[in-house]
């Protein structure tokens, strides 16, 4: 009986050693100009983002961030990935964004910056993932249904 237990233990140890795969190795992905490129999405907005080492300048659609996003809340939203990664003022960001409204566009830029930072510095993936910046927010507007006023709102009901 002891021999059977020893052989089963050995079998279990062998299976555990064989089954455990190595963690995926994330490598740096840069273009020929030394920039990391990523696309970010939020609602109907799509942002194409390029990140490179610099002074912290953010340019959106050839305009400065203060001009494009006048609301301070949206500017704070865009800087969140840098704060989570402790890299404020170390990267320049150039992005083009289209579709959706300003809030969706800010979310798309934030998503793109987060992905581009992980391409530039793969070790930043863990803190950004923990902050929820890499995961795409899949919530989109629910479509309007026929026979209803809006997506869920019914027309006013009259009993008589």
UniProtKB/Swiss-Prot annotation:
<protein>
    <recommendedName>
        <fullName>Small ribosomal subunit protein uS9</fullName>
    </recommendedName>
</protein>
<dbReference type="InterPro" id="IPR020568">
    <property type="entry name" value="Ribosomal_Su5_D2-typ_SF"/>
</dbReference>
<dbReference type="GO" id="GO:0003735">
    <property type="term" value="F:structural constituent of ribosome"/>
</dbReference>
<dbReference type="InterPro" id="IPR023035">
    <property type="entry name" value="Ribosomal_uS9_bac/plastid"/>
</dbReference>
<dbReference type="InterPro" id="IPR000754">
    <property type="entry name" value="Ribosomal_uS9"/>
</dbReference>
<dbReference type="GO" id="GO:0022627">
    <property type="term" value="C:cytosolic small ribosomal subunit"/>
</dbReference>
<comment type="similarity">
    <text>Belongs to the universal ribosomal protein uS9 family.</text>
</comment>
<keyword id="KW-0687">Ribonucleoprotein</keyword>
<dbReference type="Pfam" id="PF00380">
    <property type="entry name" value="Ribosomal_S9"/>
</dbReference>
<dbReference type="InterPro" id="IPR014721">
    <property type="entry name" value="Ribsml_uS5_D2-typ_fold_subgr"/>
</dbReference>
<dbReference type="InterPro" id="IPR020574">
    <property type="entry name" value="Ribosomal_uS9_CS"/>
</dbReference>
<dbReference type="GO" id="GO:0006412">
    <property type="term" value="P:translation"/>
</dbReference>
<keyword id="KW-0689">Ribosomal protein</keyword>
<dbReference type="GO" id="GO:0003723">
    <property type="term" value="F:RNA binding"/>
</dbReference>
